[in-house]
């Protein structure tokens, strides 16, 4: 299995398969490259696919510091240099999208061909001028999710990660699976139900302090000013059953991005690429194989 060492001495793991134009898969918080296991073989039939484990995730190492989005963007820059990749397309799920936003803020779009965003917002927290942030379900309640709710979430996360990791795994699925008391209905049928035991086990493997540090990094960012600077074609995908962000988020992003299209996935939540891999893979292949970036 390939690894490379960053300039701060961290050994990072990545998967690589296929030949041709590079496509980089960036996973979300608490996940790993394994969360793209339904995409890698399909995409590798057409492209060279690289799927890194972000620092602190999967088989990659971490330090107690440098747990920031700026560092993750630098890790990505160094991985591209290590593999001598001068141009690539990126498929970015959740935190992976914030990494590519941070990457563009620091390094521009010069080495980017196209971008696919999976169920993500440019700003996690709601504010007076932003109503497309996280909802109250993130603190197990109805309504909005504010600063105090975020602190509560962090305290629960750090108190008992094994218990909270189950909540994380459930929350990336469908919002219709929750009742008014924010209780998850495991008996219901939904897309991707067969993956739930695996999602539980994978989520448990994370370190609470790593997750908390990256969550703070994510929740303090506002990438709205970056969107108009993204000069490459973008595909915005989201789950119509997502617990995370409303459709208005993607309408806003489409208006701010110079070249973007939006596709909603019925019956899917935050993990739409896991829940409906065939539709997702076909949609992404069509986008990546369409006319190249200008």
PLM regions: where:
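Alpha/beta-hydrolase active-site loop signature
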Residues: 30, 54-58, 97, 122, ...
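Conserved acidic catalytic loop of the alpha/beta-hydrolase fold
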Residues: 70-88
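Conserved hydrolase catalytic core segment
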Residues: 86-131
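Flexible "cap/lid" loop of the alpha/beta hydrolase fold
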Residues: 112-161
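Conserved loop-alpha-helix segment in the C-terminal half of the alpha/beta-hydrolase fold
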Residues: 228-268
């Amino acid at each position: 299995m390939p690894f490379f060492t960053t300039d701060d001495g961290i050994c990072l793991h990545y998967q690589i398969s296929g030949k041709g134009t590079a496509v980089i898969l960036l996973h979300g918080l608490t996940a790993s490259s394994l969360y793209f296991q339904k995409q890698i073989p399909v995409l590798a039939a057409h492209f060279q696919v690289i799927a890194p484990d972000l620092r602190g995730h999967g088989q990659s190492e971490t330090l107690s510091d440098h747990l920031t989005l700026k560092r993750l963007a630098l890790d990505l820059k160094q991985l591209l240099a290590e593999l001598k990749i001068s141009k690539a397309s990126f498929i970015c799920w959740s935190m992976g999208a914030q990494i590519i936003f941070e990457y563009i803020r620091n390094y521009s779009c010069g080495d980017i061909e196209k971008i696919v965003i999976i169920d993500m917002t440019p700003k996690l927290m709601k504010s007076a001028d932003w109503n497309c942030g996280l909802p109250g379900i993130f603190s197990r309640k109805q309504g909005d999710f504010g600063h105090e709710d975020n602190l509560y979430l962090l305290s629960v996360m750090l108190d008992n990660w094994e218990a909270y990791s189950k909540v994380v795994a459930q929350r990336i699925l469908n919002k219709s699976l929750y009742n008014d008391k924010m209780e998850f209905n495991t008996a219901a049928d939904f897309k991707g139900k067969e993956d739930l035991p695996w999602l539980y086990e994978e989520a448990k493997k994370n370190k609470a302090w790593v997750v908390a540090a990256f969550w703070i990094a994510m929740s303090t960012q506002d990438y709205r000013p970056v969107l108009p600077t993204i000069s490459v074609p973008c595909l915005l995908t989201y789950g119509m059953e997502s617990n995370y962000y409303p459709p208005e988020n993607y309408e806003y992003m489409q208006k701010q991005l110079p070249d973007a299209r939006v596709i909603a996935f019925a019956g899917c939540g935050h993990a739409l690429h896991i829940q409906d891999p065939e539709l997702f893979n076909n949609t992404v292949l069509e986008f990546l194989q369409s006319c190249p970036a200008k």
